[in-house]
């Protein structure tokens, strides 16, 4: 098609010379070439794949027809500004047939078009700059890890205690303890060798953990680990963040069998660990034993003398029971319901817990936010709040939060 257009242009070159005797028309075309900045147009044409002659000479009209195909989409946006540009954008292809109606206004409006060519070039380039800014690669930034992958605030003793207490048999093997910790806390799914060594050291060097050998009915590898029966409540109110006291067992077994037979009660008390009994209860029990021995020795006396030791013994018994009751109020039993946000009942899912949500508990646990495969039941469903008797203070939380998070009424 290019050859056909060229041939058509050469055929009509002689006819145009008969119509226009004056050669100024062609000089004005060359002036228009410099005024319009056709060099930049030709470079734009070469960028789009249309290579043609850079100088507008004999085939100037032919170049104009090709310029229309490449430039009219970008020039039509500016054509309403000038009348000459509108004539150029509309009738560029018809220049081969009627050159004089379009060339004279274009030659007259050369300065205005020259001012607009730079603007057109800038419009052609601006999408490229904008796209380069959009597609610019962002610098890799090291963001902080979320709370689900943060280190839990529990010690290794707390983790082991939680794992053992949640098991139905209250004893676990070492691999089961590892697996329970990794399932509940995603942080421990990496660097396993480090923290597993720490778990083994904690099991070996703490008196609150006992190693139970496997029974014949439970074949397998590895011994079981369980909590010492006298360890009691090591963690205050079921909170595993801090131990209330360190458990140490007095392993002072009597080697004399005669002392075992004569002093069975004292031997059992020496085998017991110091986390179970207080000095006050020991002194009261000693006084009780002494009073009973006095009562036995005084049985051979007269009834009035014998009545006084019995009444004294009853008085001491009542005092001893009152001391035990007082200690029962001070020291909670081993089996109790944990209502602390970091207790094992709140960490593990339980279908029996249908308590209301305490907003302070919600805030604390969502701050740490330890996810697990049971994240749906752990994070929301199993966080039991205070008991039904201890209703939450809703006025405080309404003052703290602008909008209530959960229905605390």
UniProtKB/Swiss-Prot annotation:
DNA-binding region(s) from the entry: 150-241
Keywords: Developmental protein, DNA-binding, Nucleus
Basic and acidic residues bias spans: 250-262
BP terms from Gene Ontology: anatomical structure morphogenesis; axial mesoderm morphogenesis; cell differentiation; central nervous system myelin formation; endoderm development; floor plate development; oligodendrocyte cell fate commitment; regulation of transcription by RNA polymerase II
Region (Disordered), start-end ranges: 250-315
Principal localisation: nucleus
Claim: Ribosomal protein is one of the keywords in the record: no
SUPFAM superfamilies: Winged helix' DNA-binding domain
Induction: By mesoderm-inducing factor activin A.
Amino acid composition bias (Low complexity), ranges on this chain: 263-286
InterPro entries: Fork-head_N, Fork_head_dom, Forkhead_box_C, FOX_domain-containing, TF_fork_head_CS_1, TF_fork_head_CS_2, WH-like_DNA-bd_sf, WH_DNA-bd_sf
One MF annotation (Gene Ontology) recorded for this entry: DNA-binding transcription factor activity, RNA polymerase II-specific
Protein origin, superkingdom: Eukaryota
Subcellular location: Nucleus
Functional note: May play a crucial role in specification of both the axial mesendoderm and the ventral nervous system.
Descriptive protein name: Forkhead box protein A2
The organism of origin for this protein: Danio rerio (Zebrafish)
Gene (name only): foxa2
